[in-house]
Amino acid sequence: MTDVSRVLKEARDQGRLTTLDYANLIFDDFMELHGDRHFSDDGAIVGGLAYLAGQPVTVIGIQKGKNLQDNLARNFGQPNPEGYRKALRLMKQAEKFGRPVVTFINTAGAYPGVGAEERGQGEAIAKNLMEMSDLKVPIIAIIIGEGGSGGALALAVADQVWMLENTMYAVLSPEGFASILWKDGSRATEAAELMKITAGELYQMGIVDRIIPEHGYFSSEIVDIIKANLIEQITSLQAKPLDQLLDERYQRFRKY
């Protein structure tokens, strides 16, 4: 098994910690909030309020299920537009009250169904990109599994983007890439090697800012590492003047 195929397998492992796991293990007193105030509540995106080292924060993330029944309720971690609108509602609320935002990302991509398109999937994603680029509070995004396409990017326009060691981040799935390029989805591993989807490759290109180690660590130790890094980096980001924070975020994405 090549390194990239191993990363693909581990990134998609159903046993990985989910957004709700991290929300309850890293933060104190997490309280989930529901609904986009327009259409419905999307189970594929969860979010709410919590405390980190005594400071109020907003936590938002894409939630996959841990079994078939849970996955059906969570739409296999593929958000509908109402999920992205719920996330934006919580981010604007965080901006109003001066709370830092932490997002967790694990999705193959936004849901491509007819209903999602009819309800404005593209608009919902685009609006998140626009609003996050100018959100007046610190944002840290963490990829905890798959980071697929615009569905992942809609929660990843952040001051810092981190990846766990065995996760992936790409414009689309390797299977989709292979199907488009070669009309053969079975060449997914070959496609993944061309796409440069691993944490190490993306760190070298400056697309991600930090890699959270996983190899040789228990889940509880990984949680502790993320928590310590979040406390350190949020404190650092909050110390920056607002104009500098927003300009650095803008320049971070313009350099691509």
UniProtKB/Swiss-Prot annotation:
Keyword Cytoplasm in the entry? The reply is yes
* SUPFAM superfamilies listed in its UniProt record: ClpP/crotonase
Name the pathway it acts in: Lipid metabolism; malonyl-CoA biosynthesis; malonyl-CoA from acetyl-CoA: step 1/1
- Tell me, in one coarse class, where this protein mainly resides: cytoplasm
Q: Which residues form the CoA carboxyltransferase C-terminal domain?
A: 1-236
> What are the GO cellular component annotations?
acetyl-CoA carboxylase complex
Keyword annotations: ATP-binding, Cytoplasm, Fatty acid biosynthesis, Fatty acid metabolism, Lipid biosynthesis, Lipid metabolism, Nucleotide-binding, Transferase
By its UniProt entry, which HAMAP family does this protein fall under? Answer: AcetylCoA_CT_alpha
Share what the entry says about its subunit structure, partners included: Acetyl-CoA carboxylase is a heterohexamer composed of biotin carboxyl carrier protein (AccB), biotin carboxylase (AccC) and two subunits each of ACCase subunit alpha (AccA) and ACCase subunit beta (AccD).
Protein name (database record): Acetyl-coenzyme A carboxylase carboxyl transferase subunit alpha
What is the taxonomic lineage of the source species? Bacteria, Bacillati, Bacillota, Bacilli, Lactobacillales
